[in-house]
Amino acid sequence: MFLTVKLLLGQRCSLKVSGQESVATLKRLVSRRLKVPEEQQHLLFRGQLLEDDKHLSDYCIGPNASINVIMQPLEKMALKEAHQPQTQPLWHQLGLVLAKHFEPQDAKAVLQLLRQEHEERLQKISLEHLEQLAQYLLAEEPHVEPAGERELEAKARPQSSCDMEEKEEAAADQ
């Protein structure tokens, strides 16, 4: 399929790619054609920022689509790189691990299946599941109150009969 890639400064080019190409590969092609360093590129399709580790088909980019390129200024790039550790996307690292244990075609197929399964599972997550996960993680996290806060709360609220019974039980246990 052919894609039209437009720079905001007016330059444009047409590139022949497949839907299975990664966004990182498209950036490489744009870099060669329009002389824009990959690190400075932000690719947009229908207002959505394209992530390097995803494929064009993940964004439903079809033939004759138009991709916009936004260039990040060099000063911002230098600041961004200074504050971020250099890490590679999970899928790239996983691909390297798979390449050590499988033939190239098999590693690519396994990686594709893993990505597809991951995306499908993400689509199935409901708000209720996310809330359950958050509650579980918060329950595991030890809650530490600043010293003296409990005493202040106890003095501030009126004592109920339940509070009185708890105090009596605590005194009896001692």
Swiss-Prot record:
Keyword field contains Secreted: no
Residue ranges, compositional bias (Basic and acidic residues): 141-156
Compartments reported by the entry: Cytoplasm
A GO CC term assigned to this protein in UniProt: cytoplasm
Stored InterPro entries: Ubiquitin-like_dom (IPR000626), Ubiquitin-like_domsf (IPR029071), Ubl4_C_TUGS (IPR041421), UBL4B (IPR043317)
Extra remark: May have arisen from retrotransposition of the X-linked UBL4A gene during mammalian evolution.
Protein name: Ubiquitin-like protein 4B
Organism this protein belongs to: Homo sapiens
